[in-house]
Swiss-Prot record:
It comes from Oryctolagus cuniculus (Rabbit). This is Sodium/glucose cotransporter 2. It catalyses: D-glucose(out) + Na(+)(out) = D-glucose(in) + Na(+)(in). Residues 571-601 are annotated as: Disordered. PROSITE patterns: NA_SOLUT_SYMP_1, NA_SOLUT_SYMP_2, NA_SOLUT_SYMP_3. Electrogenic Na(+)-coupled sugar symporter that actively transports D-glucose at the plasma membrane, with a Na(+) to sugar coupling ratio of 1:1. Transporter activity is driven by a transmembrane Na(+) electrochemical gradient set by the Na(+)/K(+) pump. Unlike SLC5A1/SGLT1, requires the auxiliary protein PDZK1IP1/MAP17 for full transporter activity. Has a primary role in D-glucose reabsorption from glomerular filtrate across the brush border of the early proximal tubules of the kidney. Residues 45-63, 115-136, 296-309, 407-423, 477-481, 547-651 are cytoplasmic. Expressed in the small intestine and kidney. The lineage of its organism: Eukaryota, Metazoa, Chordata, Craniata, Vertebrata. One of its GO terms (molecular function) is D-glucose:sodium symporter activity. GO terms for cellular component: apical plasma membrane.
Amino acid sequence: MEEHMEAGSRLGLGDHGALIDNPADIAVIAAYFLLVIGVGLWSMCRTNRGTVGGYFLAGRSMVWWPVGASLFASNIGSGHFVGLAGTGAANGLAVAGFEWNALFVVLLLGWLFAPVYLTAGVITMPQYLRKRFGGHRIRLYLSVLSLFLYIFTKISVDMFSGAVFIQQALGWNIYASVIALLGITMVYTVTGGLAALMYTDTVQTFVIIAGAFILTGYAFHEVGGYSGLFDKYMGAMTSLTVSEDPAVGNISSSCYRPRPDSYHLLRDPVTGDLPWPALLLGLTIVSGWYWCSDQVIVQRCLAGRNLTHIKAGCILCGYLKLTPMFLMVMPGMISRILYPDEVACVAPEVCKRVCGTEVGCSNIAYPRLVVKLMPNGLRGLMLAVMLAALMSSLASIFNSSSTLFTMDIYTLRPRAGEGELLLVGRLWVVFIVAVSVAWLPVVQAAQGGQLFDYIQSVSSYLAPPVSAVFVVALFVPRVNEKGAFWGLIGGLLMGLARLIPEFSFGTGSCVRPSACPAFLCRVHYLYFAIVLFFCSGLLIIIVSLCTAPIPRKHLHRLVFSLRHSKEEREDLDADELEAPASPPVQNGRPEHAVEMEEPQAPGPGLFRQCLLWFCGMNRGRAGGPAPPTQEEEAAAARRLEDINEDPRWSRVVNLNALLMMAVAMFFWGFYA
């Protein structure tokens, strides 16, 4: 271990003595990419990508295990490997609470939220709110807010995290490598649709788990096992504690010593970096937005074959969420033990030399383990793991943002046919890629040591009003559109009142604290999320009680208490849905009408046929399956909205859910 500590201490930013540049590593990486491309091509041949439902919801035919694997892979991006390991290195075990909290919230998705989404017959979350409340403004507001968060938070986190790993492990040019990754991700997102994503997610989940297990084994062996981690972590401190900057000078020991509560999940409600009331309640609110109303996650559930498969997929995802504590957080702590002068650097000029940022280098904890501990071949496997995480997360964002833009914003154009929607959805992915590349300089210039916490705080300032709207929409039938809209607006203004000052003053660091006034910025962001959630919910209910209620005939199968209702529902968006249906030649399916009117027209050439197949847009052409009739579409819709379950399998998934919660409670209690 001493050799690794010395080597780590000597390594600077420009020292790339352990790059992935040998035949074994390159062969593993190439094999991985061939596997992913092969799975994507197979799913392109196997699945229906020529309809909106097929492209965006995988035809709602996925069984439980790809649903669960895709939920996990869509959530676990490279930001988790870099961010969780980095925060674990800096502050100890508590950050694993983010993952173990999700164990319970994902069950809420399967048992409470998904049944209503299914019976509502929707593709996107703003679509659900359009049916539930009517009007356009809530749907449009949420679509724009979600796209904003996708582009400027989720993509930026993945771009930064992937860039950190590539820079540390490869020494490649950041722009060239990330643009190449974005390009490959875009290809199988544009061509394959959601089914291709979910099958490749399944493959990548196994790659992620296998590679992370291998590295964890090497890390624990190097540190002396599980007991070695807990014996040595509290003594993992940098020896370089005097800054060359006279304004900084001798740095306080509180800035470089591990926290006294590093081994505890539940920390002091006032002085803790993750106070236990905030972790249990505030995080549940933010997690509720992400797991129960965020398009990236819910879209995977809506692709399930039936409600039982959706619930089983949520359970599988929950079991997988047990692993980040041991596969990411603890390896990050081990990295601090092995390389304290790098991972735990505190002097601004030292950190600048090691990782290019002055606020700290804890984010290099996981990449440093890969570069220094893994042998040839396995090092390439771990790069493949990081690429898998990055590409999976980005592909999920690309597909889901495409769905949001196409189904919630572009459909405001009343004469948009299905072929046009499919084309626009694919072009939107290309646009997102271009924005991502343009955003790279901003990400690279960001203070990386604070990026992970920054993203969590941004979610806490913007997400609670959305969580409040979805909770009351499902469980309080009396709530109406006016209440929901003004609750969202009031919550947004309240969140911006905290977000803008924090943006302006910066988050600072232990060595150079932020100048933001205490009454604005010193309240923990998860405490703020609790206040924001209840204020938004209260405003929603007050405005709703002061205005006319929505008649019950519009609420059948749109609220939890009426999810099994058999009465016919009069959708508040019925006029919007009926408008394109007549006359069909002009609006509903213009491409089919053209084919019927011009049967004598010559078919497309060979190259055009191949291109149309590659993009999944050859449905209804010669040799392809005929478009479904209106009766077939209605029957399929009734089948997909059915939430009845086989009693035997329903009991099986319920027992598994109880077992998973018992296991989670044991771990919470053990590390509390």
